[in-house]
């Protein structure tokens, strides 16, 4: 029990380290104001609580409006842009936890492979953190950063549910998954791609 508690503490500590490390890089390279493509539209509609292009992104706009109220800069675009580095860094921390879950399922978990498991997950998460697509969306006001976080969160909760499905509280994970998928449609429809993964978890795991 004590060993497992130590491993959990190490795991969550590394996730926090990943969050702050990637946030520092994303914030350092963040767009200081409005950038290209849809960002100007999202910033403007967040500020006035307007309606962007279909199918709309109401949850993203509400969060953007909240960040626009923070008195951290005179530039509204800068305030709203800050949300993307935060949520993108959180996605990387979640990815680290997801990788650990996958490795546990692929290999029998022993004390000897803890370093290998955490090391592999840490490197994999950092590698993804600085891929072009993720980094590009982590530095401007776009829906993809938050959508990626919601998708990762649904995947992580699905894995936790499958791991604890024999326990009495497993239904809580399913309720959270369904609720988050509903919220995610107010950001982007990307989250619907998790449905096949959830279905496979129901059948196979």
Which residues make up each language-model segment?
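Transmembrane-helix signature of polytopic, membrane-embedded enzymes
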Residues: 13, 95-130, 165-169
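Membrane-interface alpha helices of multi-pass inner-membrane proteins
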Residues: 45-48, 124-125, 173-187
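Loop-to-helix entry region of an early transmembrane alpha helix in multi-pass inner-membrane enzymes
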Residues: 58, 70-93, 97-98, 114, ...
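Transmembrane-helix motifs of polytopic, lipid-linked glycan transferases
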Residues: 16, 82-111, 153-157, 203
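Aromatic- and kink-enriched transmembrane "portal" helix at the membrane-lumen/periplasm boundary
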Residues: 28, 73-77, 81, 109-114, ...
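Membrane-interface transmembrane helices that cradle and orient dolichyl/undecaprenyl
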Residues: 108-115, 154-173, 181, 201-202
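Start-transfer (signal-anchor) and selected internal transmembrane alpha helices
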Residues: 1-25, 110-123, 203
